[in-house]
């Protein structure tokens, strides 16, 4: 099972539409939801962004930050759908995930047990605690 983390805490995963692997993305303009690996080039999705409802980006390790870059690039390319980080994202990384463009984080039950909801909620005020805002005073 998976737990979805948002700014309001833990929630069950209610997404029931499934995901298509990036390599199997249909060539037509059918609305879809895509699983993107951490080594993907998001530029390959540029002509399909309006057809994609949700993109779920894999984090194979908490030390692998490529997913943050992919999310940021997708937002800069104009993706307005839902972005979900999936995998080994830690509570300490939640603010960075939100700042880079993610709407939510999907973690497994084991990680949710090791890092309970209160640890994630402590990072939920991600807009108020960013480095550039502190520099501006």
List each language-model region with its residue ranges.
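Catalytic cores of alpha/beta
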Residues: 43-47, 90-104
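C-terminal helical cap(s) of enzyme catalytic domains, especially alpha/beta-barrels
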Residues: 114-137
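Phosphate/adenylate-binding glycine loop and adjacent helical scaffold
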Residues: 3-10, 16, 28, 35-40, ...
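Glycine-rich beta-to-alpha transition loops that act as phosphate-gripper elements at the mouths
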Residues: 84-90
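A structural motif
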Residues: 52, 79-80, 102
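Glycine-rich phosphate-binding active-site loops on the catalytic face of alpha/beta enzymes
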Residues: 102-120
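Glycine/Thr-rich beta-alpha phosphate-binding loop at enzyme active sites
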Residues: 29-76
């Amino acid at each position: 099972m998976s737990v979805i983390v948002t700014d309001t805490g833990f929630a069950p995963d209610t997404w029931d539409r499934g995901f298509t692997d990036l390599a199997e993305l249909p060539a037509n303009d059918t609305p879809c939801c895509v699983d993107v690996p951490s080594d993907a080039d998001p530029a390959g999705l540029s002509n399909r962004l309006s057809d994609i409802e949700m993109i779920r980006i894999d984090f194979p390790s908490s030390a692998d930050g490529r997913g943050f870059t992919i999310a940021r690039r997708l937002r800069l390319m104009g993706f307005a759908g839902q972005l979900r980080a999936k995998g080994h994202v830690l509570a300490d990384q939640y603010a960075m995930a939100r700042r880079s463009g993610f709407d939510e984080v999907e973690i497994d039950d084991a990680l949710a047990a090791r890092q309970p909801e209160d640890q994630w909620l402590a990072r939920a005020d991600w807009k108020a605690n960013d480095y550039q805002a502190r520099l501006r005073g």
